[in-house]
C-alpha cells in the first residue's frame, strides 16, 4: 500500500492516506471566532489527504481553553468557511472535530454567563492556562442534570449542521 495513493473514506475520496490529527492551537479570538492565522495554518497543511480540525466548541458552555474556536454563531461559521475554502482550493479535505471540554475548563476562558458543566461534579486534577492569570487550578464543575442532556445533544446537532454550512466535509465526535 502506497501512503500517497487515494483512499475512499465514506463519501470522501482523499487524495492520499496522510491524515492530520487534531491539535489545540489557541489561535481563535476572544469570541471563539477563527482568525486569519488559522486560514494560513490549515491552507499550508492542505496537501494531507484529510485534516481533522482542532477541537471546536459546539456551544459557549463547551469552551474551556483560552482562544479556542466555536461553531455556534454566524461569525464563527463564516470564519470556518474561509478556512475550509482555503483548504479546498488547495485540493484538501477537512472535518470538524466537535469538542465539549466538560470539567477541564476555566471561567476565565469562557464567555460571561457560560458554565463549567460535566457528567459529575468531580473536579479534575491539574491546572489550565488563562491569558488573564496564567496557570489556574481546574474548577469545580456543576453536574449536568438528566433533563439537560437533550439540550447538549441539540448543541451537537446544531454544531454539525453549522459545520456543513461552514464548508466542512464531515464531522468527528
Please state what every model-predicted region is.
Residues 9-10, 17-36, 45, 50:
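N-terminal binding-site loop/beta-alpha segment at the start of enzyme catalytic domains
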Residues 1-16, 119-122, 126-128:
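N-terminal carbohydrate-binding accessory modules
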Residues 5, 18-21, 51-53, 94-96, ...:
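Hydrophobic faces of well-ordered beta-strands that scaffold small-molecule active sites
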Residues 38-59, 166-170:
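Catalytic domains of carbohydrate-active enzymes, especially glycoside hydrolases
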Residues 17, 55-112, 146-147:
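Acidic/aromatic-lined carbohydrate-recognition and catalytic surfaces
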Residues 20, 45, 87, 96, ...:
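Conserved, mostly hydrophobic/aromatic
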Residues 33-45, 151-161:
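Short, acidic/polar
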Residues 99-161:
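Non-globular sequence segments
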Amino acid at each position: 500500500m502506497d501512503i500517497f495513493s487515494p483512499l475512499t473514506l465514506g463519501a470522501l475520496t482523499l487524495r492520499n492516506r496522510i491524515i492530520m490529527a487534531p491539535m489545540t492551537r489557541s489561535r481563535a479570538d476572544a469570541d471563539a471566532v477563527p482568525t486569519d492565522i488559522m486560514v494560513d495554518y490549515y491552507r499550508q497543511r492542505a496537501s494531507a489527504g484529510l485534516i481533522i480540525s482542532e477541537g471546536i466548541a459546539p456551544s459557549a458552555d463547551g469552551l474551556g481553553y483560552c482562544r479556542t474556536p466555536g461553531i455556534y454563531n454566524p461569525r464563527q461559521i463564516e470564519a470556518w468557511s474561509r478556512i475550509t475554502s482555503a483548504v479546498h482550493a488547495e485540493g484538501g479535505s477537512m472535518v470538524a472535530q466537535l469538542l465539549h471540554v466538560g470539567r477541564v475548563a476555566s471561567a476565565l476562558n469562557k464567555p460571561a454567563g457560560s458554565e463549567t458543566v460535566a457528567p459529575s461534579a468531580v473536579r479534575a486534577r491539574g491546572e489550565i492556562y488563562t491569558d488573564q492569570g496564567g496557570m489556574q487550578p481546574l474548577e469545580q464543575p456543576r453536574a449536568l442534570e438528566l433533563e439537560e442532556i437533550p439540550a447538549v445533544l441539540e448543541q451537537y446537532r446544531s454544531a454539525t449542521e453549522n459545520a456543513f454550512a461552514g464548508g466542512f466535509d464531515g464531522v468527528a465526535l
